């Protein structure tokens, strides 16, 4: 059996994990600083056929990274800055594992790159919207996707040891463009001159030391003897810019309760029914029922069971499962069940408590989950039927779709209706920073 056959018959990818199961990352929290240390297990690849040498990564590495960052968001809200570094000698991260890519199908590579992109975008999203800052403490060679991970952080500190360099060697070595935002972030985020960026992307060995700083490829450099102190100083400076409450108390995030069978995924708030003959899946999101906790104390007591948070976690896991494990299901039908008034009441609770850290992080998870639908490479159709609750936050589900079909019952008092609210006007911006209403109607003032 060859590596490609192994990949085709491999078990389902599971996006649920926890720190006790990590093989590649370690998470350490001290006060308002969290440290994520990369020490990728060479023999811990998600699929057979390759070894994760030189801190190169595959999907399993990024699943752990995403889980760790999410735990910092919810279990450690006192953390104001995350330091990303490496435990390997003279190696920070060498990027995506080339042998993994070589034995992977095109669809696998698409899903892999999409998830790694979303994970790095999530770092920037949390920095911009929620005040969680990130420092890349680059203590060794930093190439390809490793540099793209560093680029997603707020600042990059490079060790000046005469050998460690940052590089994007994909073009000269592989004849492909960097796949996780490297080119865009080098020019648009770090404002590297275009001529220097051109040179940088054709230099296999990369750029190190003072030149890397002069070219704006990193923010600062430090000699090995001063590196630890420089990391601490940079972390303290970034923490001072954070809006997160250093006295906040976190909640516990446990494994999702779900049942996965051949043609069905069942969560507490989301159900996915698969019709293989039609190559389509129906996502049904259940709206909130009853009154929600409406004070910071009550919301905190509800924890992971707070409906908007629980729904976001269920929906996100369902999306990731379907994207990765059901490649032949090309059409997703999006439905909702519930009372539109209850959804708008939920949004009122979120609006009234938007300064409370758990509500802010819940809105952030919803924002990132809706963005996953925006780029899921499937045909998405929203079906607005009797009993639907496409209102406010849940209307965003329909607005992420390619098309929206509304059952017309003009003479029926119980005809389905949609409703907009405050949530649809800026809570969940797309990658373009527009609301989905703005994007759908191209910012028209009137219909």
Describe the residue ranges of each PLM region.
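Small-residue-centered hinge/linker elements
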Residues: 34, 38-48, 57, 61, ...
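Generic, ordered loop/turn and secondary-structure boundary motif
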Residues: 23, 55-58, 93, 99-102, ...
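Charged, low-complexity, helix/coiled-coil-prone segments
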Residues: 2-16, 53-65, 133, 158-159, ...
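Short secondary-structure boundary/capping segments
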Residues: 51-52, 97-105, 153-154, 219, ...
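Extended N-terminal export/anchoring regions of large proteins
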Residues: 4-12, 20-22, 48-55, 62-64, ...
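Amphipathic alpha-helical segments at domain termini/boundaries
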Residues: 1-45, 148-152, 191-303, 307, ...
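Conserved catalytic cores of soluble enzyme domains
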Residues: 2, 107-246, 355, 359-447
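A structural preference for short, pocket-lining loop segments at secondary-structure junctions
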Residues: 31-38, 58-107, 117-137, 159-163, ...
């Amino acid at each position: 059996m060859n590596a490609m056959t192994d990949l085709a018959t491999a078990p389902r990818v599971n996006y649920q994990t926890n720190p006790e199961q990590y093989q590649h990352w370690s998470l350490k929290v001290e006060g308002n600083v969290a440290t994520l240390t990369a020490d990728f297990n060479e023999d811990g690849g998600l699929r057979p056929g390759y070894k994760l040498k030189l801190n190169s990564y595959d999907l399993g590495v990024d699943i752990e990274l995403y889980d760790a960052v999410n735990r910092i968001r919810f279990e450690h809200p006192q953390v104001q800055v995350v330091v990303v570094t490496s435990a390997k000698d003279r190696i920070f991260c060498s990027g995506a594992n080339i042998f993994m890519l070589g034995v992977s199908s095109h669809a696998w590579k698409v899903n892999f790159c999409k998830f790694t992109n979303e994970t790095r975008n999530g770092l920037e999203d949390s920095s911009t919207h929620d005040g969680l800052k990130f420092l890349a403490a680059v203590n060794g060679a930093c190439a390809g996707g490793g540099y793209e991970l560093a680029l997603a952080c707020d600042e990059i500190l490079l060790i000046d040891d005469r050998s460690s360099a940052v590089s994007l060697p994909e073009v000269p070595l592989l004849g492909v463009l960097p796949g996780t935002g490297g080119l865009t972030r080098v020019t648009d985020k770090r404002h590297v001159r275009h001529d220097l960026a051109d040179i940088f992307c054709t230099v296999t060995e990369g750029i190190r030391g003072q030149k890397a700083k002069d070219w704006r490829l990193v923010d600062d450099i430090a000699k090995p003897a001063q590196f630890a102190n420089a990391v601490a100083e940079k972390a303290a400076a970034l923490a001072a810019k954070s809006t997160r409450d250093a006295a906040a108390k976190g909640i516990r995030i446990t494994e999702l309760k779900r049942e996965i069978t051949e043609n069905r995924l069942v969560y507490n708030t989301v159900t996915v029914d698969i019709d293989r003959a039609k190559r389509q899946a129906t996502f049904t999101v259940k709206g909130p029922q009853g009154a929600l906790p409406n004070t910071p104390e009550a919301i905190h007591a509800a924890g992971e069971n707070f409906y908007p948070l629980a729904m976001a976690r269920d929906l996100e896991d369902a999306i990731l499962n379907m994207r990765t494990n059901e490649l032949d299901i090309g059409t997703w039908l999006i439905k909702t069940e519930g009372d539109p008034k209850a959804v708008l009441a939920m949004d009122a609770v979120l609006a009234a408590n938007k300064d409370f850290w758990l509500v802010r992080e819940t809105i952030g998870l919803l924002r990132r989950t809706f963005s996953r639908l925006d780029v899921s490479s499937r045909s998405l159709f929203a079906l607005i039927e009797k009993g639907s609750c496409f209102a406010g936050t849940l209307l965003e589900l329909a607005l992420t779709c390619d098309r929206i079909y509304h059952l017309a019952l003009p003479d029926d008092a119980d005809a389905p209706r949609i409703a907009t609210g405050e949530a649809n006007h800026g809570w969940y911006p797309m990658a373009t920073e527009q609301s989905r209403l703005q994007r759908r109607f191209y910012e028209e003032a009137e219909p």
